[in-house]
Amino acid sequence: MTVKKDIKRVLVVGSWAKEQITIENIKKKPDVKIFAYMDTKNPAIVSLVDGYKIGDLGDKEQIVNYAKKEKIDLALITTAQPLSVGVVNALEKENILVFGPNKKAAKLESDKAFARQLMKKHGIKALPKFKVFKDRYKAINYAEKLDWKVAVKPIGLTEGLGVKIYGDQLKNQDDVVDYIHKIFDKKIGGDGKVLIEEKLEGAEFTIQCFVYGKHIITTPAVKDFKRLLPGDKGPNTASMGSYSNNGFLLPFMDQEDYLEAVNIIMKTLNVFNNDTGEDCKGFLYGQFMKTNDGLKLIEYNFRPGDPEWLNTLLVMDDNLVDVIKYLIDGVEKPVHFEDKATVCKYIVPKGYPKIMNQVLNVKFDAKKINNLGVKIYYSSGLDNKGKLRVGCERGIALVSKGDTIEKANTVVEKAISMIDGDFQYRKDIGAEEMIR
């Protein structure tokens, strides 16, 4: 396939920080008009775009109608909900070019068992021991066979908050049993099934890719921190922050780790094509753990990571529209990344993630923070009183780059010290003790 016309009007579907930085990147092309479809009025996105609509991210008809109204040339789907309901299929029926997976490919994220079962079927050896259960009591029996040292995962989408692990959120076997019952009783993930897998130990990292069929462009590895409290303690969150190193690797990785992870991604895409006859396309996020038994896949997301996308785009020199056009056209052109480290930290309301839908009461001078070399990204929206409100997302991300992780961290810490209000954050992200 080739792009048959110039891309002059772009729609970004999503509401948060990763959409804001996506729009910032595209905006560097002065001849492109940008539109946003959001479920919450993100003040930063509103200030950047030529037009926007607030609506239900699960309403594919409304998204298609808005795209048609604005005569969109290219739609970028960067959030999970519209992908899971088939918005890509619906847009393509209207001959709108889309960068995002169709409904079948989106199952690599929306159904946690799908990718695992696909990889197991084709002998891709990057998996922990796992089984999928429709019966809660069989799930409990399997967890007991693994000596309760398990990760318990609802099958469907849970905004990054559904996975619980023995020894962390699940303190003992009673907690494991109770959580399995809770998944079925409360229909967490909406699927009526649960994935039980062995608990992995090791260092996690993420690789994000641009994918179009058999063409793939990889980006620098990023390390994110999902736990709420310093020292990787407390409950899981959607993520409290992340860092990347200068070059493509993290301090605990080598080139072999990176290439093996990319190889696992490529094999998964190839067997998906073999089984379905369909190609994958979009932003693919692969999260891996480096264990004593080799690399293991934690999960795939078919969208940019938040906050990992902030680290990546902060140092990407190229424009997204150009990268995607070259990829679709099959033109082999390198993507350039600045040789800098990055650190990103989220400030979140106190009580998060246990308490959702809170107002984030903070005051700061954005211009002074920007002058430090720190960028501000919003994963929060304005309510009807003009207050910043955090729903299932987090709050505000601050991200900077430097010659080293430590230097980038120092600048972000200085920026956070300039923010007044009632919030919490992870001071240790980017600090020497967490760079491993």
Where are these regions (language model features)?
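ATP-binding N-terminal substructure of ATP-dependent carboxylate-amine bond-forming enzymes
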Residues: 1-104
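Short acidic-hydrophobic, aromatic-tinged amphipathic segments that line or gate anion-handling sites
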Residues: 51-58, 131-135, 166
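Generic C-terminus detector
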Residues: 385, 390-436
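Internal nucleotide-binding/catalytic subdomain
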Residues: 163-293, 298-305
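A conserved helix-loop-beta module that forms one wall/lid of the active-site cleft
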Residues: 99-162
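Short, flexible turn/loop "capping" segments at secondary-structure junctions
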Residues: 155-157, 337, 388-393
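Active-site "cap" helix and flanking loop/linker of ATP-utilizing ligase/carboxylase catalytic domains
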Residues: 258-285, 301-373, 383-384
